[in-house]
């Protein structure tokens, strides 16, 4: 069905197409028509960060920034949903145009800039959602006019506001579209920031009587030495998990494309190799007690399998959905299932 809808959608401005897709999804969900338009996703129970997931394929942050489409998105078969990025105060984001579709490359360049209605609006939306289908992650960031020296205040405020409603919280330090944000990944800065957030997490756990996992979302553009340094900090601070990776400011395989010079983060198929290398390096430098989510460039089931082979416990997709539609979710689940079955069969044959 999506293959019929996509050509019409792609005649629209990219950001307008995004909005139309979400409105159409909501209409289909509330009318009861969504099951007729999507394929059933078979369960593949998975555990990570101490949470149970109906399957290991989730939606990455960015599609539903304000938590207004949670139930409809879960109905597409995702094992978990991550909403946001949300910030303490509402902000409009960067000037338009700020979202660019590269159809032949199955890629998108965005410089959205954390446009959102603010964490209080998100909390109200989450409180009104049913979300019984799987874990809900909430991705938090800082406002663009908050100096890095005060960034921990923004992250702590958001963490305190979403803690009671989230199944896990992601600390977004890696968007390339907020000036200076990625500097927070520098080793000593990262150590101080995560230390403060871990203290807040422990205080909130005592207050609410439950531990909500805290994940760190990393950039794909770090050098090997920077990745290793970040891994040391993440291990020392005993974070619950890591998401690898966000979008890239490099332009792999796109040098001749007319949109390659647009500022912003690149996602989609060209990011797959780069993000998977970062994922694999983090896996080799972090203990198995720290689960990883692999995201970046997943456009087919084989891509999801590659993330799992590189050490991911879970995967997320977003840009791939723009080009493949909701069927990508089930395709990824089945690819991971086949990989797990093959691995299990191999172990049995060697015993």
Curated annotation (Swiss-Prot):
Cofactors, names only: FMN
Active site residues according to the UniProt entry: 175
Family annotation (InterPro entries): Aldolase_TIM (IPR013785), DHO_dehydrogenase (IPR050074), Dihydroorotate_DH_1_2 (IPR012135), Dihydroorotate_DH_2 (IPR005719), Dihydroorotate_DH_cat (IPR005720), Dihydroorotate_DH_CS (IPR001295)
Binding-site positions, FMN: 61-65, 85, 139, 172, 217, 245, 268, 297, 318-319
Binding residue positions for substrate: 65, 110-114, 172, 177, 246-247
Membrane topology note: Peripheral membrane protein
An example molecular function term from Gene Ontology annotations: dihydroorotate dehydrogenase (quinone) activity
EC primary class: oxidoreductase
Transmembrane parts of this sequence: none
Keywords: Cell membrane, Flavoprotein, FMN, Membrane, Oxidoreductase, Pyrimidine biosynthesis
Biological pathway: Pyrimidine metabolism; UMP biosynthesis via de novo pathway; orotate from (S)-dihydroorotate (quinone route): step 1/1
Cell compartments where the protein resides: Cell membrane
GO cellular component, one term: cytoplasm
Primary subcellular site in the record, as a coarse category: membrane
One Pfam family linked to the record: DHO_dh
EC number of this enzyme: 1.3.5.2
Reaction equations catalysed: (S)-dihydroorotate + a quinone = orotate + a quinol
Function as written in the Swiss-Prot or TrEMBL entry: Catalyzes the conversion of dihydroorotate to orotate with quinone as electron acceptor.
NCBIfam families named in the record: PRK05286.1-2, PRK05286.1-4, PRK05286.2-5, pyrD_sub2
HAMAP family: DHO_dh_type2
Family: Belongs to the dihydroorotate dehydrogenase family. Type 2 subfamily.
Name of the protein described by the UniProt record: Dihydroorotate dehydrogenase (quinone)
Species in which this protein is naturally found: Xylella fastidiosa (strain M12)
Biological classification of the source: Bacteria, Pseudomonadati, Pseudomonadota, Gammaproteobacteria, Lysobacterales
